[in-house]
């Protein structure tokens, strides 16, 4: 059974809505990663093994940067990691949250969706108490998920998986940084975790890029990790099809952020594109590098990144040899030697308006063909929007985590399941998730709305205001 979280959740959601553009004046405010010396690695860091701790500190965590969260202790770890290639050293930070009832042999790698490029969007900053109140619900919306997993007694490690350049959508980089965040957490002496600690990786939407690639790369990059499962949904498994799907639509701002992330990670793309961007295109990339999700999505609805107003000969953006070469390496499930070894539970709404369903399904099927044990659940209900699906499916995610942590058997091979609404699934209802289901429904109704109707309306209102002004 679960504690009655809904009152606290609704209060926080209300405060978030009422103070979205305000700064809470408090003492001892943390600094953003681009200004905080904690993020600057010590000399000689490049020679360290990936996953090596370079620096750590205790921090005070608060969801929504307002309310004190029930937890025993929290740490930030600066660690050595890799960019897209293993021989490209880098560093980043993960935030470790230890619940009061911590199970010292169970760890969850939680890759929250950042979906943006600004320094102040990094989880390690936004999660800290007294940080500026984020205008984005990316972390705040996942309040129920954080609380529920912590209530299970699982230690959380939440990496800044986009790295110091905040390279959103650079999947291989994100996968390496997520894996090394796990290694660094296991190496933190204060936690006294065993190397045999059972680990599960989770991510949704932009966070599923990190999780999906971590699942793919872990068997070769960190084979000694005791991964017992991966679960992710709303997955941009094929970056080319995702950018094409987003382009010109309501959530086109994500496409702008994705292009900026690829440009900032791949020098070959930067060299090719920088003299081709128009003033509008350059301004757009500069804007997303300084802002977070909501600001970006509200600023760039219906933007066409394949137009000549964005880039000279804009239609060539995704078809140029340089771009095709890079994007071709960012499709999940293509290489048989990049197949998850631990059980995978993957889920996606059939009517997802942000991330194309077909690409995610194709990746899951290919992984199955390559030998992965994978359950792919397709949600067909009209209320299953991109944003709302994550919370609506929380009971299934939690059941998967419980079963993997307890060593229960999983399916062999590939299995495809069809469900209308997970909260109405008899199997979920039978598990006694009544209180959690009520929390989820209230949280969705007060944020994005069922089928994401509130979120879509807000974007449309912003677009109309921009036209008028």
UniProtKB/Swiss-Prot annotation:
GO terms for cellular component: extracellular region. The keyword Signal applies. Disulfide bonds join 121-292. Gene3D superfamilies: 1.10.260.130, alpha/beta hydrolase. GO terms for molecular function: triacylglycerol lipase activity. The active site is at 205 (nucleophile), 352, 386. InterPro entries: AB_hydrolase_fold, Lipase_secreted. Its EC number is 3.1.1.-, 3.1.1.3. Keywords: Disulfide bond, Glycoprotein, Hydrolase, Lipid degradation, Lipid metabolism, Secreted, Signal, Virulence. One of its GO terms (biological process) is lipid catabolic process. It catalyses: a triacylglycerol + H2O = a diacylglycerol + a fatty acid + H(+); a monoacylglycerol + H2O = glycerol + a fatty acid + H(+); a diacylglycerol + H2O = a monoacylglycerol + a fatty acid + H(+). Secreted lipase that hydrolyzes acylglycerol lipids such as triacylglycerols and consequently releases free fatty acid. Generates free oleic acid from the substrates mono- and diolein and hydrolyzes triolein in significant amounts. Due to an absence of fatty acid synthase genes in Malassezia species, secretory lipases are essential for the yeast to generate free fatty acids from degradation of sebum and assimilate them as lipid sources for growth. Plays an essential role at the pathogen-host interface during disease progression. Belongs to the AB hydrolase superfamily. Lipase family. Class Lip subfamily. This is Secreted triacylglycerol lipase LIP3. The gene is LIP3.
């Amino acid at each position: 059974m679960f504690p009655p979280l809904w009152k606290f959740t609704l209060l926080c959601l209300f405060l978030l809505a009422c103070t979205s553009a305000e700064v809470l004046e408090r003492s001892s405010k943390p600094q953003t990663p681009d200004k905080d010396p904690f993020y600057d690695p010590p000399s000689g860091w490049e020679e360290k093994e990936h996953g090596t701790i370079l620096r750590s500190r205790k921090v005070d965590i608060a969801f929504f940067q307002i309310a004190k969260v029930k937890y025993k202790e929290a740490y930030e770890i600066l660690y050595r990691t890799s960019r897209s290639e293993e021989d490209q050293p880098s560093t980043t930070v993960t935030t470790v949250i230890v619940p009061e009832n911590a199970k010292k042999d169970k760890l969850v790698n939680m890759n929250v969706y950042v979906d943006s490029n600004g320094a102040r969007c990094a989880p390690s900053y936004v999660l800290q108490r007294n940080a500026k109140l984020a205008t984005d619900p990316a972390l705040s919306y996942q309040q129920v998920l954080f609380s529920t997993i912590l209530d299970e007694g699982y230690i959380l490690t939440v990496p800044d998986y986009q790295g110091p350049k905040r390279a959103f959508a650079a999947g291989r980089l994100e996968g390496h940084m997520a894996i090394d965040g796990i290694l660094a957490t296991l190496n933190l002496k204060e936690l006294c975790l065993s190397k045999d600690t059972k680990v599960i990786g989770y991510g949704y939407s932009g966070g599923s890029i990190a999780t999906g690639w971590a699942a793919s790369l872990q068997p070769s990059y960190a084979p000694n990790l005791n991964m017992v499962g991966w679960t992710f949904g709303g997955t941009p498994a094929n970056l080319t099809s995702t950018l094409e799907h987003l382009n010109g639509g309501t959530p086109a701002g994500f496409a702008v952020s994705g292009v900026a992330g690829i440009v900032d990670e791949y020098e070959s793309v930067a060299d090719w594109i920088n003299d081709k961007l128009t003033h509008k295109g350059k301004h757009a990339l500069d804007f997303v590098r300084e802002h977070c999700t909501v600001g970006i999505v509200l600023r760039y609805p219906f933007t066409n990144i394949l137009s000549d107003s964005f880039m000279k000969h804009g239609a060539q953006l995704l078809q140029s040899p340089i771009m095709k070469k890079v994007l071709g390496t960012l499709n999940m499930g293509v290489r048989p030697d990049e197949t998850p070894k631990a059980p995978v539970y993957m889920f996606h709404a059939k009517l997802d308006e942000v991330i194309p369903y077909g690409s995610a399904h194709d990746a899951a099927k290919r992984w199955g063909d390559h030998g992965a044990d994978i359950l792919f659940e397709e949600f067909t209900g009209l209320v299953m929007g991109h944003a709302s699906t994550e919370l609506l499916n929380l009971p299934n995610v939690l059941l998967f985590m419980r079963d993997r942590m307890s060593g229960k058997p999983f399916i062999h091979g590939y299995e495809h399941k069809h469900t209308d609404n997970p909260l109405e699934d008899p199997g979920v209802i039978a598990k006694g998730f009544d209180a959690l289901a009520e929390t989820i429904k209230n949280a969705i109704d007060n944020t994005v709305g069922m089928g994401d109707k509130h979120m879509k309306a807000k974007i449309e209102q912003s677009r109309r205001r921009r036209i008028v002004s």
